[in-house]
Amino acid sequence: MAATAPKAGGSAPEAAGSAEAPLQYSLLLQYLVGDKRQPRLLEPGSLGGIPSPAKSEEQKMIERAMESCAFKAVLACVGGFVLGGAFGIFTAGIDTNVGFDPKDPYRTPTAKEVLKDMGQRGMSYAKNFAIVGAMFSCTECLVESYRGKSDWKNSVISGCITGGAIGFRAGVKAGAIGCGGFAAFSAAIDYYLR
């Protein structure tokens, strides 16, 4: 069966025969972007990538748990605790007044007193960093969930909320300054990282 060439002045669909219905673009658009659109499972193999098996229910459950606001807050709390503890020990290590007794300024502090002071400062910094990290992370996740977008505004809003909540312990003015300062810092960090 040889294909016949279309007549001069005729189009290819007409040459193929009148048995085929013309393509209705409005109907096609309904299935692609309209009301009849259905979610598609995009397999990496069909897109030119390495094919992978479908995810099991356990994998989906673990992904949902790791993407939850509670998990992100706990992760930021633990990370803040470790980072704050290291920062506190570092600052205590370079401070010349560690273990210093104001009652007896000429006495050299013992290693036990210096280590005790370093541990106290490290624990204090660790707790503060953990609280700030958990507050900021949880607030940012909740703002992102509420807005439905992931952009720089989320970190600015959550920075303002976190800074304001921390600052309001010292008064309204301190809360406003904390809100503005933490929001500006969050915006600068987000601008630098993105």
From Swiss-Prot:
Gene coding for it: Timm22
Assigned keywords, A-Z: Disulfide bond, Membrane, Mitochondrion, Mitochondrion inner membrane, Protein transport, Translocation, Transmembrane, Transmembrane helix, Transport
PTM comment: Disulfide bonds promote efficient assembly of the TIM22 complex.
Family the entry assigns: Belongs to the Tim17/Tim22/Tim23 family.
Membrane topology of the entry: Multi-pass membrane protein
Record localization: Mitochondrion inner membrane
Name recorded for this polypeptide: Mitochondrial import inner membrane translocase subunit Tim22
Stretches that traverse the bilayer: 74-94, 123-143, 170-190
Disulphide bond pairs: C69-C141, C160-C179
InterPro entries in alphabetical order: TIM22
Domain of life: Eukaryota
Keyword Membrane: yes
GO terms, molecular function: protein transporter activity
Task of the protein: Essential core component of the TIM22 complex, a complex that mediates the import and insertion of multi-pass transmembrane proteins into the mitochondrial inner membrane. In the TIM22 complex, it constitutes the voltage-activated and signal-gated channel. Forms a twin-pore translocase that uses the membrane potential as external driving force in 2 voltage-dependent steps.
Subunit structure: Component of the TIM22 complex, whose core is composed of TIMM22, associated with peripheral protein FXC1/TIMM10B and the 70 kDa heterohexamer. In most cases, the 70 kDa complex is composed of TIMM9 and TIMM10 (TIMM10A or TIMM10B). A small fraction of the 70 kDa complex is composed of TIMM8 (TIMM8A/DDP1 or TIMM8B/DDP2) and TIMM13. The TIM22 complex also contains AGK and TIMM29. Interacts directly with TIMM9, TIMM10A and FXC1/TIMM10B. Interacts (when oxidized) with TIMM29; interaction is direct.
PANTHER family, per database record: MITOCHONDRIAL IMPORT INNER MEMBRANE TRANSLOCASE SUBUNIT TIM22
GO-annotated biological processes: protein insertion into mitochondrial inner membrane
Keyword Signal: no
